[in-house]
Amino acid sequence: LSKLTTMLLIALFAGLIGTSLAAEKVTVSGSTTVLPLAEAEAETFNGQQADCQVTVTGGGTGAGITAAGEGRSEIAMASREITASEKSKYSKNAFQQFDIGYDGIVIVVSKPIYDAGVKSITKDQLKKIYAGEITNWKELNGPDKDIYAIAREDGSGTRDTFNELVMGSTAVETPGVKTVAQGSAEVKTAVTGSDKAIGYLGYSYANGSDLGALTYEGVVANVENIKNGSYPLHRHLYFYTWGQPTACAQKFIDFVIGSDGQKVAGENGFIPL
């Protein structure tokens, strides 16, 4: 290399290192439902400016709120509203809530069950499956196969919302559950890998030809029904900060809820505000 080329390369790398060191880091953690959205938003946001760099990890809604309350994350991702006990535990500062999109919990079954004719379910039927009172698909006019019910782990916002809206309480026992999945992606893998499973997922995970999305209480889980509230298992997705956001955290939040960020949401299978 010529001396001039070498000097230019040194200057270039010095500039890159300087930019990297100067960028304020924003850590986002929590809900696995929100995770793919936040990752896509962060990738676009990070590529548009150099002052703030956002990193995203999962862990579940409860873990994200804990991380924010303990000062380990600037932003918590949540698929449910913060609870009174969480507010009380970290009462030194007030949590700030930011709506970032709509979502619906979709009831999904293995493709062979769907293809055999199980295409809808009622709240009562679903509750009885997870309570262990309905145990075979033939009881729902399906094939003679045991029902393999999948639930989310403790601390999951999706689990809490499902238990509250379907089972009647977030703390309810669900003896019909055969396995507990650590995250939305794991639920989808378990359902698609079985010929007799049922589970619940956020809307963005429930698309695809490798599983069957059930009509719930006579209502299809689509964008229109989720946004207008007619789909019974509709909800909002949130960002939370513990106290006032840092400048870069606020900048990222503003991007996500702004027109560019909402476009990213729609392009990645989420339901914009």
Descriptions of predicted regions:
Residues L1-L8:
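Bacterial N-terminal signal peptides that target proteins for export
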Residues A22-L273:
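Exported/periplasmic ABC-transporter solute-binding proteins
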Residues F13-A22:
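Sec/Tat signal peptide C-region and signal peptidase I cleavage site
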